[in-house]
Amino acid sequence: MPKLLGSFISFKSPHYLVGSVRDAVSIKAQAFMIFLGAPHTALRVDPNRMQIDEGHTLMEQHNLSKSGMVVHAPYIINCASKDPVKQTFAIDVLTREVKLCHAVGAKLIVLHPGSAVEQTQTQALDHLIKVLNTVIANTKEVIICLETMAGKGNEIGRDLDQLKYVINHIEQQERIGVCLDTCHFHDSGNDFNNTAEIMETIDTKLGFEFLKVIHLNESKNVCGSKKDRHANLGEGMIGFDNLMRFIAQPQIKQIPIVLETPSDKHNYPAVYGAEIERIRAWFGAR
């Protein structure tokens, strides 16, 4: 059984962290992932308004560990941009976001690696490395987790070789890791029908010591499609049993596993509660 299983959780006014913890508790989650503001903007409220201490107290009351709390960086930044102005913006936003993570008690922040606009993939990776080393040098403790991407358009991070290249050039490697998104990994060409092959790929190309978070998602598309369209568990092309066999692996079930499957205002957070219950039922039957 996964130790830290949960989902994306809303973080919003007026209750912020307290509201997030309440939602996580309501679906019996052991982990949760939040945006510290709207995903497509850099605007953030003062941390004094985020009800952090009250949220931590509520977490303790419900045995929710801070090791299961994950933050997602805003989508608005492209840390791989060659534009000096956009690089500076990315550094400023990500630095502030990492400091906010530290303030709310999260040790992990997930980041989309960026896009290779008007440059080669390698050039984009080098720009990402520069941004990450700068941000890490100006912050503390929080681990930046580069998310595996599906490979659509000019995205970088479409394979583990690229992410390991970045890791190899980070000056403080204890501050860098990877978030493996199962939908993205499938869409970029990794077949979850073969669990052993998936695990070998992670082991040889990355190393499990750098795998810090799992985004557990189904995919609406075939393997290798490079589409990035999430589906709910049991409704996609990866296969529920394949996903369960993957997260049952000893190297996987000890890290935060977070659902990012589709939800809306009518079924949030209940849809995640139902999926968590289904996952636990699968493990309970074995």
Swiss-Prot record:
Catalytic activity: Endonucleolytic cleavage to 5'-phosphooligonucleotide end-products
GO biological process, one term: base-excision repair
Gene name per UniProt: nfo
Residues that hold Zn(2+) 3 according to the record: 184, 228, 230
Role summary: Endonuclease IV plays a role in DNA repair. It cleaves phosphodiester bonds at apurinic or apyrimidinic (AP) sites, generating a 3'-hydroxyl group and a 5'-terminal sugar phosphate.
Residues annotated as binding Zn(2+) 1: 72, 112, 147
Naturally occurring in which organism (per UniProt): Mycoplasma pneumoniae (strain ATCC 29342 / M129 / Subtype 1)
Gene Ontology molecular function: any one: zinc ion binding
Enzyme class: hydrolase
Necessary cofactors: Zn(2+)
E.C. numbers: 3.1.21.2
Keyword Membrane in record: no
The name this protein goes by in its record: Probable endonuclease 4
